[in-house]
């Protein structure tokens, strides 16, 4: 599904924006904003639900304890009362469904920006070398790798897969050819010969694991040396991997600290990611009663995540997407926090802010009043 969304939805949008302004950096920004706007109703539902639960949770927990204690000998009545409580305040899991629905699109967006044209595309093939007396008993099963769209010009791209007709198991001293081809069955090298710059996108073949068990030539010919496991990597250069944008030297550049030197553009992007994440956390807590534990978590979480991304190998283009997405998320949170709350939740919040912490009676109901984003209505 992720590959389908990437190829049929995200890459065409990317092509459209690049056609308007020939800058892959601007195309990333535009693609991110368009997808975030399209997902606005779903992410807004999650933010609203989280805001509602943050206010109602203390009251819900107290009422749940009272119900369980009062009807401990009557499970049916207990479930009935707990159901009424959920209807009154909403389920704590209500915000999960919108998140789950939008996840495939976000994963596809992430995968698109990690691949061609923004970064080099690796094909990793895990192989197993067996003794000759065992390989004869193996029923060969053809292998096909996941497909990746390879850009050879700004407007020309096609899906490419790696194939092994006899599968990933081979006998000692046996040689096999790993084929790169389009999903239509055309040989990748022959397709590249139709482009003036085609040789630029020929793969580099390496043994990333198990070099004592196997070797590979630069035309993809694999030769088994002795029994064991091995991994072959074919890496195809990304068209825009070395293209810059603003202060970013190369959108495909990976790593904060490489070969003894600091990549300050990567460091700046990671720092911007942390600051925008912190801003979003701060905005989500605005207008809420002070909570020392939650406040500490809101400060520590961005620091931990930011520190992780300093050493997590993400291309600069992906980090650019994450910063833009965080800015959009912070703006969205700011807008949604301005919406009016249902009357019963507003009363709970007012009591929390004034230190009363009163529990409202169970007759309070939001189901027949208004949605969280609607203004106060008078009947």
Swiss-Prot record:
- Annotated organism of origin: Prochlorococcus marinus subsp. pastoris (strain CCMP1986 / NIES-2087 / MED4)
Similarity comment: family membership: Belongs to the OXA1/ALB3/YidC family. Type 1 subfamily.
The protein here is known as Membrane protein insertase YidC
Q: Where are the transmembrane segments?
A: 20-42, 93-113, 264-284, 303-323
Give the bilayer topology. Multi-pass membrane protein
* Gene (name only): yidC
Family annotation (InterPro entries): YidC/ALB3/OXA1/COX18 (IPR001708), YidC/Oxa/ALB_C (IPR028055), YidC_ALB_C (IPR047196)
Question: How does the annotation summarize its subunit structure?
Answer: Interacts with the Sec translocase complex via SecD. Specifically interacts with transmembrane segments of nascent integral membrane proteins during membrane integration.
Compartment annotation: Cell inner membrane
Main localisation, per the record? membrane
Listed A to Z, the keywords are:
Cell inner membrane, Cell membrane, Chaperone, Membrane, Protein transport, Transmembrane, Transmembrane helix, Transport
Keyword Amino-acid biosynthesis appears in the UniProt entry: no
Look up keyword Transport and say if it applies: yes
Write down any Gene Ontology CC term.
plasma membrane
Q: Name one Pfam family in it.
A: 60KD_IMP
What role does it play?
Required for the insertion and/or proper folding and/or complex formation of integral membrane proteins into the membrane. Involved in integration of membrane proteins that insert both dependently and independently of the Sec translocase complex, as well as at least some lipoproteins. Aids folding of multispanning membrane proteins. Probably also aids protein insertion, folding and/or assembly of membrane complexes destined for the thylakoid.
Q: Which GO terms describe its biological process?
A: protein insertion into membrane; protein transport
Instruction: Name the Gene Ontology molecular function terms of this record.
Output: membrane insertase activity
